[in-house]
């Protein structure tokens, strides 16, 4: 989850660069033809792990069947590309904001940043033990996933759970 914040920011940054290109009169970009389906949009795709896997599998199969030097190219409208990248970034951030926010019951909140090998969230309250990691919170704030209220809650939670005066500052995790 922590790095998904960065991926969302990267997509938004790419959309921003394409907006600049559009302002300079560029109306399309050329991509490998096999990449066009990756620009598909819509919550029906984003919300379905199965549909995302199908899209990825199709893309990978197309990559394998092409011979080096024979990549077909296609033009993609810059507006379509910008919209796709921005929509994907917005969806990722919204998903993290709503699905990964954890609270401790004492008024503190922060994002779960990682999952264990069994698919369980690592952060939050677990059997009376509070777990928080600073790295994922930094990504969420730095990459604009956390809204203003969430950023304040993260700071308060870090003060409560990660600040250690004897250590001279903030620990990376509880």
At which residue positions do the language-model features occur?
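Acidic, mature catalytic/reactive cores of soluble proteins
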Residues: 1-174
């Amino acid at each position: 989850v922590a790095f998904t914040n960065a991926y969302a920011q990267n997509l938004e940054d790419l959309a921003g660069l394409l907006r600049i290109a559009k302002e300079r009169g560029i109306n399309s970009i050329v991509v490998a033809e096999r990449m066009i389906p990756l620009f598909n949009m819509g919550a029906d795709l984003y919300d379905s792990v199965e549909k995302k896997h199908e899209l990825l599998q199709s893309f990978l199969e197309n990559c394998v069947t092409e011979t080096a030097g024979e990549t077909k190219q296609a033009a993609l409208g810059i507006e379509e590309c910008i919209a796709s990248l921005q929509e994907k970034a917005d969806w990722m951030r919204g998903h993290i904001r709503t699905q990964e926010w954890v609270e401790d019951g004492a008024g503190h909140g922060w994002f779960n940043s990682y999952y264990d090998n069994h698919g369980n969230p690592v952060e939050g309250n677990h059997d009376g033990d509070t777990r928080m990691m600073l790295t994922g919170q930094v990504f969420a704030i730095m990459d604009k996933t956390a809204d203003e209220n969430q950023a304040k809650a993260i700071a308060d939670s870090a003060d409560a759970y990660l600040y250690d005066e004897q250590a001279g500052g903030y620990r990376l995790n509880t």
